[in-house]
Amino acid sequence: MPKPAFIFTPLEDSHVQAAVICANKLKIHFRVRSGGHDYEGLSFVSLIEQPFMIIDLAKLRAIQVDIAHNTAWIEVGATLGEVYYRISEKSPVHAFPAGVCPSVGVGGHITGGGYGSLHRKYGLAADNVIDARIVDANGNILDRKAMGEDLF
């Protein structure tokens, strides 16, 4: 199974944007890795017999919890355990309806729906996302307003 030609670890979202734009211009396939919990190996191997790169988002892991507004801004490389810990630092009663494995990356967990033990009462983790900043396939950085209400 082909391995990546290189691994790119961005420190901010503009670095992700640059990586996507460069990959498109150079016609290099890429995989995105958030936490690495991937039973199929889709984030670190490729069935395409061409060089590819991994955009590893593990260094994008800032978490800002705002208890007054019942919100948090979580970067994609943070793990669920880090999110739970940051919430617990601010409140003994707040939670986030997500999975039970603390080492799962937030990005992969939410894009997979975000199943967890609280989802029957509070919905999936993805149901609780009210805004996001994403880099699309063309390298554009989009937020909720730019993506439109179809995504949310």
For each of these PLM feature ranges, what is it?
Residues 1-9, 135:
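Short, basic, glycine/proline-bearing loop/turn elements
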Residues 14-152:
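FAD-binding core of FAD-dependent oxidoreductases
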